[in-house]
Amino acid sequence: MAEVKVKVQPPDADPVEIENRIIELCHQFPHGITDQVIQNEMPHIEAQQRAVAINRLLSMGQLDLLRSNTGLLYRIKDSQNAGKMKGSDNQEKLVYQIIEDAGNKGIWSRDIRYKSNLPLTEINKILKNLESKKLIKAVKSVAASKKKVYMLYNLQPDRSVTGGAWYSDQDFESEFVEVLNQQCFKFLQSKAETARESKQNPMIQRNSSFASSHEVWKYICELGISKVELSMEDIETILNTLIYDGKVEMTIIAAKEGTVGSVDGHMKLYRAVNPIIPPTGLVRAPCGLCPVFDDCHEGGEISPSNCIYMTEWLEF
C-alpha cells in the first residue's frame, strides 16, 4: 500500500496577535522596519496575513508609511499626530510624514514628489487639503523667492528659510543692517576711548578696550533700535562685517563654564582698531566711488564743474 503524505497546515494566527507583534517590532526599531524584518520575525505568517495586519494598523493611524532607498518602511506613529491624521488616506499620511521629517527647514513639492513617488497633480491636491486643515503651511524661502517650502503648521521657520533678522518679506533690510553696524562700532569705539583715558599702562588699556559679544548685544537691546528680537549670533554676524572692514579685531579667550557670553568654555572679545594704512585720496574723494564715473567729462551733462557730490564733499 502506497504511503500517503498529508500536508499539515499551520494554525491560523490571531490577527490581533500579528498586529501586536508588528507594533512591538516597531517599538524595537524606532526608525522603522521593512516587510522583510516582519517576515523574518514571523516566518509562519503568510504574506496575505501580514498585508491585512499592516493595512489595518495604517488605517487605524498606529503606523506611518515611509519610503526609503531600500523600499517601504513602517514606523510607529506619534500618539499626538495620530489624532490629526484621523480619516486621512495612506497617500495623505505619507505626504504629511515626509513634511514632518523635513522639520523647520521645510521641503519643496518637487522633493515630496521624489520621496513619495506620487503624481504631481495628486501631491498638489494633498498639499491644498493639508493646508486647509491647518496641518501644514507654505513658506517663501529667501534662497528662491519664487519657490515655497512646506512645513508643519506650528513650526517656526529656520533662519536659512526666512533669512533671520536681516530680511522682511524676502527683502534684505540693508538700512537696518547699516544702523546696527554703526551702533556696534560706536560702542566699541567708546570702550576704546574710555580705556585710553584711564592713563594706565598699555597692556591694561588694551585689555580694557575689549568687549564681549554679550556686552555688545546688551547695548543694542537697550538702545531699542530693533523691532525684531536679536540674538547674540545676529550681533556676532554684524561684528564679523566690521572685522572684514578692518574696523574691529576679535580674540578668543578661555572662560569658566557658565560665564555669561561663553560657549563651550570660550568667549569672543572684540575691540575697535585704527586702520594700519590710511585710505588713498581717490577712495576718499567722491570720484572713487561714483556710480556715473564713466559718463563724467568736462562740457557734458555730468561734469566735475557741476558735480553735486564733489560740492558736498568739499563743504564737509
Curated annotation (Swiss-Prot):
Q: Which GO terms describe its molecular function?
A: 4 iron, 4 sulfur cluster binding; DNA-directed RNA polymerase activity; double-stranded DNA binding
GO BP term, example? positive regulation of innate immune response
Q: Which residues carry this modification: N-acetylalanine?
A: A2
Keywords for this entry?
Acetylation, Antiviral defense, DNA-binding, DNA-directed RNA polymerase, Immunity, Innate immunity, Isopeptide bond, Nucleus, Transcription, Ubl conjugation
Function of the protein: DNA-dependent RNA polymerase catalyzes the transcription of DNA into RNA using the four ribonucleoside triphosphates as substrates. Specific peripheric component of RNA polymerase III (Pol III) which synthesizes small non-coding RNAs including 5S rRNA, snRNAs, tRNAs and miRNAs from at least 500 distinct genomic loci. Part of POLR3C/RPC3-POLR3F/RPC6-POLR3G/RPC7 heterotrimer that coordinates the dynamics of Pol III stalk and clamp modules during the transition from apo to elongation state.
Noted disease association is: Immunodeficiency 101, varicella zoster virus-specific: An autosomal dominant immunologic disorder characterized by reactivation of varicella zoster virus (VZV) infection in adulthood after primary childhood infection with VZV. The viral reactivation manifests as central nervous system vasculitis with stroke-like episodes and lacunar infarcts on brain imaging. Features include headache, hemiparesis, impaired balance, and other neurologic signs.
The protein depicted here goes by the name DNA-directed RNA polymerase III subunit RPC6
Gene behind this chain? POLR3F
